[in-house]
Each structure stands twice: as structure tokens, then as C-alpha cells.
Amino acid sequence: MTQLARRHDLTAVMAVDNAFDADECHCAMQAYCREVVLVPNPLGREGVTKRLLQFRSLVSIRSFERLRVTLGAMRHTLDAILSTRRFDIVNLEFPYLGHYNLRRAPYGRTPAPVVVDSHEIAFDLARQFAGANGGLGRRLYGGVNWRKLRREELRTYLGADGVYLCSTADEQRLLGALPGLRTAVVPNAADVEYYRPRPTDPPPDGRTVVYFGLLSTIPNADGVTYFAQNIWPRIAAVHPDASWKIIGGRPSPSLLALAGPQIELTGFVSDLRPHLASAAVVVVPLRLGGGTRLKIVEAMAMGKAIVSTTLGAEGIEAVSGRDLLIEDEPAGFADAVNRLLAGPSLAARIGQSARQLAVNRYGWSGAAEALEGFYRQILEEAP
């Protein structure tokens, strides 16, 4: 958005629930947008309201994800904006918002093309979550819900003028379901000038392992739990002076219970850079998820040595052994971390290569150029 705002006028329409500070969100978006319209979403993400919405979805043909963003106020807001103002492109950020009528325009004008940003293939992610849920009831509910979401998501893609994805792997998955769909790959990108090694940064302490991400999400919570149970004990046995820092907001009680002499949970931090700068190793032990992980791009931009699972690094054009280390078994993952903790020169070499890859392939300017090229292609072929 920062890059697009330099060359285009942007209008943002967003639903905001109680997990976000509306004023803070508005101020942040205003820096880049001509106009920011926030629509309150009273349908909660947690607690009783979430459970009621899940119950509604049981007796509905609609998925939970769709019900959670079906708002009369959003429909009226979009109708008012699209029918009175002219836009060149309507960019839809998530496919489960595709039920809103985006084919509106001022009288006598042709509606703008609709382009969907598929951060990940949502139904595939929901399918993974359904299989990972422990109880039979949750698995049955998840199995029904992801199939509803698949129908809704594919319908949104079919109705759009184009879909862009974060990785070639996701693009191929989607084209397998919808051959002939107009797609493009726009990689997840980081501000490589913001995330960069700085002379003022403290040097890595040589013993700190870092994981970061929003801890309320299923992939992050599962990854941290998996690492704590299966990998961290193997690291601590070899390096008893090592510490593990878990950075991210909204941890569950079970994750908070991990805190101890060697394990720190920081909660949300406003600036990741000092924490990443002090890390000897960044770990991405993910077993669930889709798209590409921005956390890897940010850590690469900071010149960090990373150990990841294959899934965690999916979609990143990195070579294991050069730009990061990839291991899928607990013993191999722990051994990779131990080698980096014991070999700072190896960690430095991998970190330097990772930084170069981030600058060359995953900077904001390159991603913005790829997206603008896709926009131009769609506009040139529009009737």
C-alpha cells in the first residue's frame, strides 16, 4: 500500500471488530489513503458471540467465515461509495467478502474490474484446521465448514476479473480447481529498508532463539506448541544456557504456561527489530498454513539465520543450506538450531545470503510493480 499510494489515489473500506483499535487503524491507513471508511463489526472473534455464530453456521448454507463478515452496514457503505465515485480497480482483500455487490458504478459508467487478493487459499487452510482439531465434534464441524467455504471462495474467484496469490504453489493449487482463471503471483514482501541490520543494533547474544507471530492464530499456536513439546527440549539439552523468546500478542493460557527460566513470552511488541537483532536463530516450525509467511521475509531482511519446516518456507524462493535451513523432523530441526547456536560464522553466512535474497526478491517496490503490472493487464483487456 505504501508503494501504491505514491502513484495512485487509494480509498479503503474496512470492517473493524473489537480486536482492533479503530482510531489507531484509521490514523495508520490515512497516511496512505485519500479516504478511509471503517465499518464496525459487532460479530466477535472470541467468546460467546463467536460460539453463537458457529451455531448459526451449523444450520446455514453459509460458512462461519462468511457469516462473520456479513454486515448490513458494510453493504450500504459499499453501495454508497461505488455508486457515487469512479474507480479504476476494486481490490478485494479476502475471498470470503465476495458476496458483496462490487459491480456498481455511477450512473452511465462501467463498473471497475474486481481483483481478489488471495493471501492464502482459505478453504485449504480451513481443511487443514479441521483435520488438526482434536475432538470429534470439532472435526465434524470443521469438515462441513471448509466445504461451504470452498464453494463460496471458488465462486468469488470465478466472478472476479483476476486473482493474485503469494506463491506459485498456491497459484497451481487454485488453477487445479479452476483451470483458465486469470492469475498472477505477487510475493509477500517486507520493507527491506525498515527491516535491515543497523549499526546501532545490539549484536546477537549467541544463545537466543526467537519465534514471532500472532499467537491466537491456529498455525502459530500449533507451531509454538509443537516446538515446545518436541524440539526445544533437544536444544536445551545441548545448550542449557540457551533461551527461547516467543513474540506475539494474544497467547492462550496454555501458551502462557510455557513461560519459565529459559522461555519468555513478550506479548505484542511495537517494534520487532531489536528483538530480531538480538536473535541468534529465528525458528518457523509451522505444520499448518497457506500462502507465504511474512515472518520469514522480515527475518531474512534482518539478516537472520532461520530454521523452518518445508511448509513454513513454502513459496519462498530460498535454498536450504544457503539462505536458511529446512528440517521437518524434530531431531533434524533441533540439530539445525544447535549447529547455528554453536557456529556463529555459519549463522552469519546464512543470514547474509538471506538478506540479499530479501532485497533482490521480496522488497516492497518489486511486489508493487508486479501488482501494478497485473492491474494494467486487466485494464487493457477490459471491455
Model-derived features with residue positions:
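N-terminal subdomain of nucleotide-sugar transferases
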Residues: 1-39, 85, 237
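Donor nucleotide-sugar binding/catalytic pocket of nucleotide-sugar-dependent glycosyltransferases
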Residues: 38, 113, 123, 142-197
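Conserved nucleotide-sugar donor-binding subdomain of glycosyltransferases
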Residues: 47-103, 137-159
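Acidic donor-binding loop of glycosyltransferase active sites
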Residues: 161, 263, 277-291, 302-305
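Conserved catalytic-core segment of nucleotide-activated headgroup transferases in glycan assembly
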Residues: 185-278
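Short hydrophobic beta-strand element within catalytic cores of glycosyltransferases
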Residues: 295-298, 305-309, 325
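Conserved acidic donor-binding segment of nucleotide-sugar-dependent glycosyltransferases
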Residues: 324-331, 339-344
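A short, well-ordered alpha-helix in the C-terminal region of glycosyltransferases
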Residues: 346-361, 370-373
